[in-house]
Amino acid sequence: MKGLFIRIVLAICLSLWAIDMVFPWQQIVRSKQNYHTTIQERQKLIVGTINNPVSYFIGTNGETGLEYELSKAFANYLNVDLEMFPLNSADALFQALAQGKIDIAAASLFYQQDRSEKFKLGPAYHAASWQLTYRKGERRPITLENLSGKLVIPANSALNNILLAKKEKYPSLTWETSELSQEELLFQVAEGKIDYTIATSTEVSVNQQIKPQIAIAFNVTDEFTVHWYLSDKGSSELQAALLDFMNSAIENGLIARIEEKYFNHLNQFDYVDTRSYLNAIETVLPKYAPLFEKYKGDLDWRLLAAISYQESHWNPEATSPTGVRGMMMLTKATADRMNITNRLDPEQSIKAGSEYLHLLLKQMPDTILKEDRIWFALAAYNMGLGHLLDVRRLTKQLGGNPDNWLEVKKNLPLLAQKRYFTHLKYGYARGYEAFQYVENIRRYMNSIMNYYRLQQNQQDRQDRYENENNDVISTQTQQEQR
């Protein structure tokens, strides 16, 4: 319901935004050859963003993130290449935009009155609120009035103006600013280094998957709409093109699919499960990661690892009452089909599980979008291909799109309801388990990706420190030799 509400709000925002600008630019919207001249001449769209697990980061398979996927779709719409230009803060983004270094600033940026007066505003495409966070286990504050410790927010953040307005109601409210990023401040809360910080609900949900000690005290604000920002000079054509694109992206379900991919699986945060899983990533996964890498085939090895954790918690001797066994919890029939002799052997189990999943992927209809095929295949891996075919037929009967995972997954629980399963070819199935199965795997994969991203960032910082230190030592040595 929340996703539907947000899409309704976004549609209304789009309509109001369109009324404000459509009359001067209606001819531009109708004519693609009038799109932003500079972009067309250089054949490249340059989008500024912030490197974080929500907007943009480099994964094993290259660039990814919500803003990257939406920017890539817009670049394709304009029929130009895309260059992502990552920066460290919103201030740096707006400075680059003012200087003409980027065409668009896209980093889950909230609507701000002062910035909307200096830059052109794109249509709303998402919504989120500001939330006060504290360390789990500490006393939970009720309002901004009774904070018993230090509140720290990023320097030059939009939060500063929000808190200044709140201070009129809560005169005792104080806060400090820091040059650390929002993600780094959330980590400091989790580690007990600071008492509180405020972050967007999206950032909190994502970072709870890798720092489960982050707890939400309360919403500081209602939901704000999220926008792209454009330069105030010479961007009217680009703004009109963006309106056209965003309207299409809402109508064809692109925004809903991207939102579902990055956010929906985060809704069911489980503190105990996340702590156990992160501990397993640190202590158990390194032993089996080479095998997941070896047998990944066309998959991301982290997806294969997430499937195995969902199946067995990376326990090679796992056995269920139904007879499935091993790292990938294979049935005897599947093991025989994949020609393995010992389901309790980790390598054989991972190899067979991967091969079986690839086999299921090949059986998915070509009409299913590439990015959705794996989720359909995973549902089939869990409950059987026949039941997946049933839920696709049922989705079509109910007026939905059987090739759209977002529409199909909501019907999975219906496979356990008598009014539906009695009319299905393969009958009853615990579809609600398949639904949760896929959601868990997506959440586990997200945690693995972010864990390794943070490890790489830490290593990069250490390398930079050592290089800078070596440069200083080298300079001092040269001076001494003189």
From Swiss-Prot:
Compartment annotation: Cell outer membrane
Name of a matching Pfam family: SLT
Annotated spans, Non-LT domain: 19-266
Catalytic activity as recorded in UniProt: Exolytic cleavage of the (1->4)-beta-glycosidic linkage between N-acetylmuramic acid (MurNAc) and N-acetylglucosamine (GlcNAc) residues in peptidoglycan, from either the reducing or the non-reducing ends of the peptidoglycan chains, with concomitant formation of a 1,6-anhydrobond in the MurNAc residue
UniProt-recorded Gene Ontology molecular function terms: peptidoglycan lytic transglycosylase activity
Top-rank lineage group of the source organism: Bacteria
Primary location class: membrane
LT domain as annotated region, ranges: 267-482
Active site per database record: 311
Tagged with keyword Cell wall biogenesis/degradation: yes
InterPro entries from the UniProt entry: Lysozyme-like_dom_sf, MltF, Solute-binding_3/MltF_N, Transglyc_AS, Transglycosylase_SLT_dom_1
Enzyme Commission number(s) of this protein: 4.2.2.n1
Protein's membrane topology: Peripheral membrane protein
Disulfide bonds: none
Signal peptide positions (record): 1-18
An example Gene Ontology CC term for this record: cell outer membrane
GO biological process, one term: peptidoglycan catabolic process
Keywords: Cell outer membrane, Cell wall biogenesis/degradation, Lyase, Membrane, Signal
Family note: In the N-terminal section; belongs to the bacterial solute-binding protein 3 family.
Comment on protein domains: The N-terminal domain does not have lytic activity and probably modulates enzymatic activity. The C-terminal domain is the catalytic active domain.
Record's function text: Murein-degrading enzyme that degrades murein glycan strands and insoluble, high-molecular weight murein sacculi, with the concomitant formation of a 1,6-anhydromuramoyl product. Lytic transglycosylases (LTs) play an integral role in the metabolism of the peptidoglycan (PG) sacculus. Their lytic action creates space within the PG sacculus to allow for its expansion as well as for the insertion of various structures such as secretion systems and flagella.
Protein known as: Membrane-bound lytic murein transglycosylase F
Name of encoding gene: mltF
